A protein has these predicted regions:
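Acyl-CoA thioester-binding alpha/beta core of soluble enzymes
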Residues: 1-250, 278
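Alpha-helical scaffold elements within enzyme catalytic domains, especially in hydrolases
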Residues: 162, 235, 260, 283-284
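Glycine-rich phosphate-binding loop and adjoining beta1-alpha1-beta2 segment
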Residues: 241, 245-271
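A structured beta-alpha segment of the ubiquitous adenosine-cofactor-binding alpha/beta core
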Residues: 266-285
């Protein structure tokens, strides 16, 4: 297997995009890449993107560790494994069996369909309530054939306008140029890839030297639900942060998604996240 520093243009581009948004400098000189093949054939270069982003995350964590007195570290990333981790649910097993025991991840309500005007929309009914709302709107059975027939009744813009009004997880497939001209795309392009906001109270609790993990002593309240938010909080927990996940005792989720995003966290069950969020956050500890 070929091992080298980050040299692939897309890997470097992803790394530098994150690095340029940070308030401190990071360096990829101590990162090695195992150039393993992609695990899926796709025109989307997800593996190289993942390598760049995960390398930047590793550099950031290593920097924070050194600031807090931990020794410098090196990092080796496997390109194929980085791609797998973008869909880490497939790496979870229970008593030797994959936790993805059914077809929920590839059900017809998770798909891309052609509209009346020849464009395409993508929908994702990953959680039960999202699936049910999509089925109610399209008034169809949960099959690819039924979804395609229902989607073809309207134009892409008509469907997206309805989706916005009804809070449905659906959007039009757009080119990069179309996204740049769209209000949402323009707003995104106007902001840095990472935003930092402060409450002007950060000096009340200053972290000292770390003994074992770079983020030990960091306290996090997680009020997110789906995938991205829990995944981010899981990354913090992996590096030593004390993460409390607030969730209802009986929730609308899919077991593999919940398990994948809950490693290393404490679970606080509440019937209302709004009530939990209004609590003085220090009372959780």
């Amino acid at each position: 297997m070929v091992v080298s520093m980050i040299t692939h243009p897309l890997q470097l581009k992803a790394y530098e995009a994150v690095a340029s948004a940070l308030p401190f400098k990071i360096d990829h000189a101590n990162i090695e890449i195992e150039h393993a093949p992609s695990y899926v054939i796709s025109c989307v270069k997800a593996h190289d993107y993942a390598v760049g982003v995960m390398a930047a995350m590793g550099s950031t964590i290593e920097h924070l560790g050194r600031v807090r007195g931990l020794p410098a570290q090196t990092l080796r990333l496997n390109r194929r494994r980085c791609g797998f981790l973008l869909n880490s649910l497939q790496l979870l097993f229970l008593n030797g069996y994959s936790t993805i025991m059914d077809t929920w991840g590839v059900n017809p309500d998770n798909g891309t369909y052609r509209t009346k005007d020849g464009r395409y929309v993508t929908m994702i009914g990953m959680h039960p309530h999202l699936r049910d709302r999509l089925l109610t709107y399209f008034d169809c059975a949960n099959s690819s054939k039924a979804f395609q027939a229902a989607v073809e009744r309207k134009t892409a813009q008509e469907i997206e306008d309805d989706a916005i009004r009804l809070d449905l997880p659906l959007g039009i497939l757009r080119t990069p140029a179309e996204w740049a001209a769209h209000p949402q795309g323009a707003a995104t392009l106007s902001r840095p890839i990472i935003d930092f906001e402060t409450t002007k109270t950060e000096k009340r609790r200053v972290l000292g030297a770390a003994k074992h993990r770079p983020l030990e002593g960091v306290r996090v309240i997680e009020l997110t639900h789906m995938v991205a938010g829990p995944a981010c909080a899981r990354l913090l927990a992996e590096q030593g942060a004390d993460v409390i996940k607030v969730q209802p005792p009986i929730g609308d989720w899919v077991f593999p998604v919940w398990m994948d995003g809950s490693w290393g966290k404490k679970i606080f069950c509440s019937t209302s996240k709004a009530v939990a969020a209004r609590r003085d956050s220090t009372s959780f500890w």
